[in-house]
């Protein structure tokens, strides 16, 4: 069903059950499958495929050859109903793949608002991506990865399954992480990424003042430079968190870890 006739190229294939807002644009040779909902102002470029169940919000751009809402790349998947939900104002570039969830991972993959996913990015099943993130070319997220707001992942970088990447973190080009990355932390390019300080420049651009950045740097030194066991580091962070909401957020992230922390 459609509100009115959207701006659809005559070579595009739209399933009768798909619901497109009246101003949605669909380019040449694109496929919109069953149980797909696309919100107002969204543009689907040429040669894209969007499979359901998938819910897409407003003002998104799928540039070309993107494969969205496909079956999860998980051998345990047996055709059960799972879904993908994408928010508003995202830019999805060429050959990006975003898969639906799996029953074992909660049944849903989510992408928030105002994210940029550049060419050949892969977001696997059951991932949860926040808002205002930038994934450079060939970023790869394995299954069940959680990414906070304002995260930047450079080209050819990736995250192991079940990892969490905290808000405002930065993964350098080619960085690979097999552990949780605390908020604000930069990860370098090694065989397995290692912490390389605080993303100070990014924080300045987002309006963090000197006092906030100083508190975050102090927390980073406590966690990574002081040589403390994690238990002792968390005790010191708890004291620092009394005067810093940012440090409190770091500590809450660490306390919620279900796998190893990147150290």
Swiss-Prot record:
What's in the GO CC field? Answer: cytoplasm; membrane
- This protein's pathway: Glycolipid biosynthesis; lipid IV(A) biosynthesis; lipid IV(A) from (3R)-3-hydroxytetradecanoyl-[acyl-carrier-protein] and UDP-N-acetyl-alpha-D-glucosamine: step 1/6
One BP term from GO: lipid A biosynthetic process
Molecular function (GO) terms for this protein are:
acyl-[acyl-carrier-protein]-UDP-N-acetylglucosamine O-acyltransferase activity
Domain of life of the organism in this record? Bacteria
Q: What is its main location?
A: cytoplasm
Might you give the EC number(s) for this enzyme?
2.3.1.129
User: Where does it localize?
Assistant: Cytoplasm
> Sorted alphabetically, which Pfam families does this protein's record hold?
Acetyltransf_11, Hexapep
Q: TM spans, by residue?
A: none
Q: Which UniProt keywords apply?
A: Acyltransferase, Cytoplasm, Lipid A biosynthesis, Lipid biosynthesis, Lipid metabolism, Repeat, Transferase
Asked if the Swiss-Prot or TrEMBL record annotates the protein with the keyword Transferase, the reply is yes
The keyword Cytoplasm is assigned to this record:
yes
Q: Which reaction does it catalyse?
A: a (3R)-hydroxyacyl-[ACP] + UDP-N-acetyl-alpha-D-glucosamine = a UDP-3-O-[(3R)-3-hydroxyacyl]-N-acetyl-alpha-D-glucosamine + holo-[ACP]
Regarding protein family, the annotation reads: Belongs to the transferase hexapeptide repeat family. LpxA subfamily.
Q: What binding partners and quaternary form does the record give?
A: Homotrimer.
Could you tell me what this protein does?
A: Involved in the biosynthesis of lipid A, a phosphorylated glycolipid that anchors the lipopolysaccharide to the outer membrane of the cell.
Q: Kindly provide the name given to this protein in its UniProt entry.
A: Acyl-[acyl-carrier-protein]--UDP-N-acetylglucosamine O-acyltransferase
- Which organism is this protein's natural source? Xanthomonas oryzae pv. oryzae (strain KACC10331 / KXO85)
